[in-house]
Regions:
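Long, low-complexity segments enriched in small/aliphatic residues
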Residues: 284-329
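Short, solvent-exposed beta-strand edge segments and adjacent coil->beta transition regions
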Residues: 6-7, 224-228, 312, 325, ...
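Structured functional modules or segments
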Residues: 348-428
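Short, surface-exposed, low-complexity cationic segments
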Residues: 330-345
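Short, solvent-exposed loop/turn motifs
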Residues: 62, 160, 323-325, 386, ...
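Glycine-centered loop/turn motifs
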Residues: 214-216, 312, 415, 421
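ATP-dependent carboxylate activation and anion-phosphoryl transfer catalytic cores
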Residues: 1-5, 11-302, 343-347, 352
């Protein structure tokens, strides 16, 4: 009941999963938000995540500024947000906006707020209201040309809204990509470490809101959002192409990032058609295709003192709102992969990590904190069975056995901090 960001939210698909799901949800909620109350609600199988930006002042005025589609996500955490949402009828869009305003007025809310909803088969359901600006408020700013932060300050100072509902005009299309320190080829495992180089993209219609610079350390103890890449263009197709160009220009070295995943997602036919749902990334796609395309690009490669050989490359550039392909002679160095459309996932899989190399050792795939040990010496385990739960960067990761056998040794306890490669347990 308390919190957000996907924490304390568990899907239960049958009676035998209720106890474990409840225990995990309440443990996360208590750890992150200090409250462990939980509630049960209907689970929608293929919804889209649509949210409405609202504003209300102390003078009785309330408006909605359009919707954002946040359906491209993993672990209930958003990867891509865009406005307007593709495929929504004007009738549904207006109904959602008016419902969001009623929510704000019904509870006497003032200032900026985000009413989140789930949409499926022509119907929508209230999910929650975030009483603040969202990370993705930037896309609404770009399509409405309204400074929402400045408006928030004015309303907090007791001033009335500077615009009414009829003054809100939405133009063009905006897309935001959340660039996270994660390895998409390993189930979006967190990738803490030092950023050795960060170069932000530029050009018309491109905005970079970053929290790190070259040389900064990304800690395991905090959220792994490196920055937000936001683009605007007159229509959705141009916005997607502009986002792809900016992602190729963005350089983040020293850690794994979601840049290759974003390129694959933006280029996928499902995203282009707007048929994706909140389950799309985790259940329908096989992002391990990025490995063959160079999924670890962005992690700084070793270099020597010898000068790089020059090779001829075709580089996309944008000048005065127009895109060109320019042939250039550049150093023969690794570049971020184009990562074409991701392949269909052969079957749904859970977001979890495996430890060890099949020799019976269970190792930590990343730096983190052990939150729960699921086995004891003498227990029999199967291949793929969860052995421990490791928390890193606000995410719980189940560490699975890669070999069947009997647990001979458990070397850690709940609360222990471990590093990548540390042996957690031994299976014989």
């Amino acid at each position: 009941a308390y919190g957000g960001g996907g924490k304390g939210l568990k899907v239960v698909r049958g009676p035998d999963e209720v106890e474990a799901g409840f225990e995990s949800a309440t443990r996360e909620a208590a750890a992150y938000f200090g409250r462990s109350e939980a509630y049960l609600e209907r689970y929608l199988t293929r919804p889209r995540h649509i949210e409405i930006q609202v504003f209300a002042d102390t003078h009785g005025n309330a408006v909605w500024l359009g919707e954002r589609d946040c359906s491209t996500q993993r672990r209930h955490q958003k990867l891509i947000e865009e406005s307007p949402a593709i495929g929504l009828s004007d009738e549904i869009r207006r109904a959602m906006g008016e419902a969001a305003v009623q929510v704000a007025q019904g509870c006497g809310y003032t200032n900026a707020g985000t009413v989140e909803m789930l949409y499926q088969d022509g119907e929508f359901w209230f999910l929650e209201m975030n009483t603040r600006l969202q990370v993705e408020h930037c896309v609404t700013e770009m399509v409405t040309q309204r400074d929402l932060v400045a408006e928030q300050i004015r309303v907090a100072a007791g001033e009335p809204l500077s615009f009414g509902q009829d003054d809100i005009v939405r133009t063009g299309h905006a897309i935001e990509c959340r660039i996270n320190a994660e390895d998409a080829t390993r189930g979006f495992l967190p990738s803490p470490g030092r950023i050795t180089r960060l170069r932000a993209p530029g050009g018309p219609g491109v905005r970079w809101d970053g929290g790190y610079e070259s040389g900064d350390e990304i800690s395991q103890y905090y959220d792994n959002l490196v920055g937000k890449l936001i683009v605007w263009a007159p229509d959705r197709g141009q916005a997607v192409r502009r986002a792809v160009r900016a992602l190729h220009e963005l350089q983040v070295e020293g850690i794994h990032t979601t840049i290759p995943a974003h390129l694959a997602l933006l280029g996928h036919p499902d995203f282009g058609a707007g048929t994706h749902s909140t389950k799309w990334v985790e259940e329908d796609l096989d992002l391990t295709a990025l490995i063959a395309a160079g999924g670890s690009a962005g992690v700084e490669a070793p270099v020597d003192d010898a000068p790089d050989a020059l090779v001829e490359r075709t580089v996309p550039v944008e000048v005065n709102g127009k895109r060109f392909s320019v042939r250039m002679w550049l150093p023969d160095a690794p570049v971020a992969p184009a990562a074409g459309p991701a392949r269909a996932r052969p079957r749904p899989t859970a977001s979890s990590g495996s430890g060890g190399a099949g020799d019976g050792t269970v190792t930590a795939p990343m730096q983190g904190t052990i939150v729960k040990v699921l086995v004891a010496p003498g227990d029999a385990v199967e291949v793929g069975q969860a052995v421990l739960v490791l928390e890193a960067m606000k995410m719980e990761n189940h560490i699975n056995a890669e070999t069947a056998g009997t647990v001979a040794e458990v070397r850690v306890a709940a609360g222990d901090t471990v590093g990548p490669g540390d042996v957690l347990a031994v299976i014989e």
